[in-house]
């Protein structure tokens, strides 16, 4: 009898490590869903804000996957459901976020992000993103602290300055290059005139053609004037 008890006790001791390994592996399988989100997000009144949330699951995405976003105002323990997803998007139709929450993710890429349109100062608070993808249902729930502020004069000024740099600097560079080129050309002409530079046959021909053209224009103007005078005299008689 004592020998039998010792044998059973030995088997129990031998099975304990095996059971421990199975429990640990099972826990790893259940807890393999990981969710990540920005801890702090800053936005401006009236400008759309994106709240990013990504997840990694060991299981394939199916129609059983669910996503839930909640909101908690500052200095409050009350939470408000603002978005639900299961094969389709279901943004809230009540409360302060009514008609302002839109889907900005892709579950097949592990993206569970949403966007807030026309944010106000009243939207400040804490947002949470919860994802369940059976059998992966246990996971961490990351929190995102949203801070909405008015755009200050400094921010607007920086935007104007950036626009000025992008528009006016290239134009200024082009103008400077043209002025430098014109200056070099004028300097070259002065040096040639001082050193007794003689024009080539092509340059002389161009000047001659220009003079002939000017003479022709002068003659044409004189001829037109004579015709007008003759017509005037005939009408007088």
Curated annotation (Swiss-Prot):
Topology in the lipid bilayer: Single-pass type I membrane protein
Question: Which segments does the entry list as coiled coil?
Answer: none
Which parts of the sequence belong to the Ig-like V-type domain?
33-149
Could you say which residues form the signal peptide? 1-32
Print the keywords alphabetically. Cell adhesion, Disease variant, Disulfide bond, Glycoprotein, Immunoglobulin domain, Membrane, Signal, Transmembrane, Transmembrane helix
PROSITE patterns, from UniProt?
Answer: IG_LIKE (PS50835)
* Expression tissues: Present in all tissues tested, including the skin. Present in the keratinocytes and sebocytes in the skin (at protein level).
Q: Name one GO biological process term.
A: extracellular matrix organization
All ranges on the Extracellular side of the membrane: 33-159
Q: Name one GO cellular component term.
A: membrane
- Spans through the membrane: 160-180
Write out the function statement from the record.
Mediates homophilic cell-cell adhesion.
PANTHER family attached to this UniProt entry: MYELIN P0 RELATED, MYELIN PROTEIN ZERO-LIKE PROTEIN 3
Q: What is this protein called?
A: Myelin protein zero-like protein 3
From which organism does this entry originate? Mus musculus
């Amino acid at each position: 009898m004592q020998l039998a008890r010792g044998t059973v006790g030995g088997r129990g001791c031998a099975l304990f490590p095996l059971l421990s390994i199975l429990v640990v592996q099972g826990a790893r399988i259940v807890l393999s869903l990981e969710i990540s989100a920005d801890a702090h997000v800053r936005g401006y009144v009236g400008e759309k804000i994106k709240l990013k949330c990504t997840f990694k699951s060991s299981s394939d995405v199916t129609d059983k996957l669910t996503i839930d976003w909640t909101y908690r105002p500052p200095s409050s323990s009350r939470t408000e459901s603002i978005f639900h997803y299961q094969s389709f998007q279901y943004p809230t139709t009540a409360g302060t976020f009514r008609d302002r929450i839109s889907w900005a993710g892709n579950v097949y890429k592990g993206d569970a992000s949403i966007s807030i349109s026309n944010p106000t100062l009243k939207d400040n608070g804490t947002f949470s993103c919860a994802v369940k993808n059976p059998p992966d249902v246990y996971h961490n729930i990351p929190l995102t602290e949203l801070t909405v502020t008015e755009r200050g004069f400094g921010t607007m000024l920086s935007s104007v300055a950036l626009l000025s740099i992008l528009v006016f600097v290239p134009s200024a560079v082009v103008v400077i290059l043209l002025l430098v080129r014109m200056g070099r050309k004028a300097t070259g002409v002065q040096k040639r005139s001082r050193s007794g530079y003689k024009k080539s046959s092509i340059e002389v021909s161009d000047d001659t053609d220009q003079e002939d053209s000017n003479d022709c224009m002068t003659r044409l103007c004189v001829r037109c004037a004579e015709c007008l005078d003759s017509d005037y005299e005939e009408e007088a008689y």
